Regions:
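Conserved N-terminal substructure of TIR/SEFIR domains
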Residues: 1-90
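Cross-kingdom TIR/SEFIR domain
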Residues: 2-14, 56, 76-145
Length: 145
């Protein structure tokens, strides 16, 4: 299912209702709270915040790289090393798959690394979001998620 930006706004508003309906299912069968590495395009903050809100209402613990104080101020090799550590640390990997994120080299790099770490465990997913014209690029390989 591909979401439009308008539909994402509607879902954000409905997250409170979803939260109440799913309070009893906030933990996985292991009894641990879900933790999610959230990959996203940095200039698409609005979409990221809405997706993060929905996941937090479902009681997931979220990692967003630009909120991490240990990140270097300028993108570098150490940036990639920290991202790799965080992808390994968090239980699940979700790409906020906007058209911009699909075009982003960093998002694709993160998706590739996340795939290597999480795919066999079934703990990787896309959160596809189309612009309101319902045009979502996607890539053929993204169909496996």
């Amino acid at each position: 299912m591909i979401l439009t930006e308008n539909k994402l706004k509607e879902l954000t508003l409905a997250a409170d209702v979803l939260s109440e309906a799913h309070r009893q299912t906030r933990f996985f069968s292991t009894g641990q709270q879900a933790s999610v590495f959230l990959s996203h395009k940095h200039d698409e903050i609005s979409q990221l915040k809405r997706v993060a809100y929905i996941l937090e209402e479902l009681h997931a613990s979220i990692y967003v790289d630009w909120l991490d104080n240990s990140m270097p101020p300028k993108t570098s090799g150490p940036t990639a090393a920290i991202i790799k550590q965080q992808i390994q640390k968090y239980d699940k990997f979700i790409l906020v798959a906007t058209n911009g994120a699909i075009d982003s080299k960093w998002c694709n790099w993160e998706l590739g690394y996340g795939d290597a770490q999480k795919f066999d465990l079934g703990k990787i997913a896309l959160f596809p979001i189309a612009q309101n014209d319902n045009n979502w690029k996607g890539s053929e390989y993204m169909q496996i998620y």
